[in-house]
Amino acid sequence: MTAILERRENSSLWARFCEWITSTENRLYIGWFGVIMIPCLLTATSVFIIAFIAAPPVDIDGIREPVSGSLLYGNNIITGAVIPTSNAIGLHFYPIWEAASLDEWLYNGGPYQLIVCHFLLGVYCYMGREWELSFRLGMRPWIAVAYSAPVAAASAVFLVYPIGQGSFSDGMPLGISGTFNFMIVFQAEHNILMHPFHMLGVAGVFGGSLFSAMHGSLVTSSLIRETTENESANEGYRFGQEEETYNIVAAHGYFGRLIFQYASFNNSRSLHFFLAAWPVIGIWFTALGLSTMAFNLNGFNFNQSVVDSQGRVLNTWADIINRANLGMEVMHERNAHNFPLDLASTNSSSNN
C-alpha cells in the first residue's frame, strides 16, 4: 500500500513539473525547448565572458604563433575577441577532455568551439521555444519563421563556413575587430560584394530599415488626437483599447499622393506581413550566399572583362575591387604562407 501511494506521489510530482514547464501563466515561459536553451545559453555566455577577459593567446593558424584576444593580455573592448579554435585542430570535436591538459585546450582555442556549439544549440532552442509558445497560445507560427533569418546567418558564419573551409579557425572571431577582420578576409577570398545573394541581403537590411522608418513615421504622424497640446500624444493610448490609435486612411492617402496610389498599402495585415517578409527573405539569401561561398562558389568575377580593339585592358570597378582583394589577401595570415594562392599561378601574376 505504501509503495502504491509513493508511485502516485511521484507521478503527481512529474505531472506538476510538466505542467509548470509548459504553463503559459509563468512570468517567463520555459517550455521543453527552454529546458535545453537555458543551460546552453548560460554556458555560452559564462564562458564567453571569462574567455574575453582572461583567456591566454591562441595558436589560431596552427603555426606556433599565438594571437592574444583577451583583456588581461593587452586588448581593449574594441580589439578584444574570443579567438577561434586552432587550425591544428581543424574540424575535430575538441572538448576539454580531448586535450592533454587545460593549458593545451586553451592554447588551441577550445573555448571558441565550446561557446559556438552551446550558443547555436541555444538559439535553435530559442526559435523552437518561440514556436512552442505560439502553438500553446493558439497563435500563428510566423514569429519563429522570422527569427530563422538571424539563426541561419549565425549558423552560416559559425558552423557552415568553417565546415566548408575545413577548420574552425576560419569561423568568425567573437569580438568587434575580429568581426571586421572576418568580413575583410571573406571579401578577399570570396568576393562577397559581387555575389547576388549578398546584394539581396543588403537590400533586405537597408530596405527593411527604410520601410520600418516610413511605417513608424506615418503612424506617428497620423495618430488620432486624444490629448491636449499640453499632454504627450502617447497618453492618448490605453493598452488593449478596441479603437484604432491612428488613421490608416489618412496615412494611405498621404503616402499615395507622395509617391503614387499603389505604392501605399490599404490593408494593415498585408502591410505588416511585407514589413516582416522583406528583411527576413533578404537575410535568408545572405545566409544562403555565405553557405555557398563556404564551399568556394564565390561572387562574380568580371576582372579584365573590357578590352579595346588592340586587346588592351580597360579597367572597370571590378578590376579595382580585384586589386583591393589581392591587397587584403596578401596581408591575411602573412606568416602562414609567403603569398596568397591567387598569386601562385603564372596566369594570375601575369594579369597584374
Swiss-Prot record:
Q: What is its EC number?
A: 1.10.3.9
Q: Where is this site: Tyrosine radical intermediate?
A: 161
What InterPro entries does the annotation carry? D1/D2, Photo_II_D1/D2_sf, Photo_RC_L/M, Photo_RC_L/M_CS, PSII_D1
- The N-acetylthreonine modification is found at 2
Name the keywords, alphabetized.
Acetylation, Calcium, Chlorophyll, Chloroplast, Chromophore, Electron transport, Herbicide resistance, Iron, Magnesium, Manganese, Membrane, Metal-binding, Oxidoreductase, Phosphoprotein, Photosynthesis, Photosystem II, Plastid, Thylakoid, Transmembrane, Transmembrane helix, Transport
Mutating residue 251 to V has which effect? Herbicide resistance
What's the name of its gene?
psbA
Impact after mutating residue 275 to F: Herbicide resistance
Please outline how this chain is modified post-translation. Answer: Tyr-161 forms a radical intermediate that is referred to as redox-active TyrZ, YZ or Y-Z. C-terminally processed by CTPA; processing is essential to allow assembly of the oxygen-evolving complex and thus photosynthetic growth.
Q: Which GO terms describe its molecular function?
A: chlorophyll binding; electron transporter, transferring electrons within the cyclic electron transport pathway of photosynthesis activity; iron ion binding; oxidoreductase activity, acting on diphenols and related substances as donors, oxygen as acceptor; oxygen evolving activity
Can you tell me which residues bind pheophytin a?
126
What's this protein's name?
Photosystem II protein D1
Purpose of the protein:
This is one of the two reaction center proteins of photosystem II. Photosystem II (PSII) is a light-driven water:plastoquinone oxidoreductase that uses light energy to abstract electrons from H(2)O, generating O(2) and a proton gradient subsequently used for ATP formation. It consists of a core antenna complex that captures photons, and an electron transfer chain that converts photonic excitation into a charge separation. The D1/D2 (PsbA/PsbD) reaction center heterodimer binds P680, the primary electron donor of PSII as well as several subsequent electron acceptors.
GO cellular component terms?
A: chloroplast thylakoid membrane; photosystem II
User: What more does the entry say?
Assistant: 2 of the reaction center chlorophylls (ChlD1 and ChlD2) are entirely coordinated by water.
Residues with site note (Cleavage): 344-345
Entry binding sites for chlorophyll a ChlzD1: 118
Query: How and how many cofactors are bound, per the record note?
Result: The D1/D2 heterodimer binds P680, chlorophylls that are the primary electron donor of PSII, and subsequent electron acceptors. It shares a non-heme iron and each subunit binds pheophytin, quinone, additional chlorophylls, carotenoids and lipids. D1 provides most of the ligands for the Mn4-Ca-O5 cluster of the oxygen-evolving complex (OEC). There is also a Cl(-1) ion associated with D1 and D2, which is required for oxygen evolution. The PSII complex binds additional chlorophylls, carotenoids and specific lipids.
Q: Subunit comment for this entry?
A: PSII is composed of 1 copy each of membrane proteins PsbA, PsbB, PsbC, PsbD, PsbE, PsbF, PsbH, PsbI, PsbJ, PsbK, PsbL, PsbM, PsbT, PsbX, PsbY, PsbZ, Psb30/Ycf12, at least 3 peripheral proteins of the oxygen-evolving complex and a large number of cofactors. It forms dimeric complexes.
Per the record, what is the consequence of mutating residue 275 to P? Herbicide resistance
- Quote the record's binding site residues for a quinone: 215, 264-265
User: Where along this sequence does the record place binding of [CaMn4O5] cluster?
Assistant: 170, 189, 332-333, 342, 344
Impact after mutating residue 255 to Y: Herbicide resistance
Output the PROSITE patterns linked to this UniProt entry: REACTION_CENTER
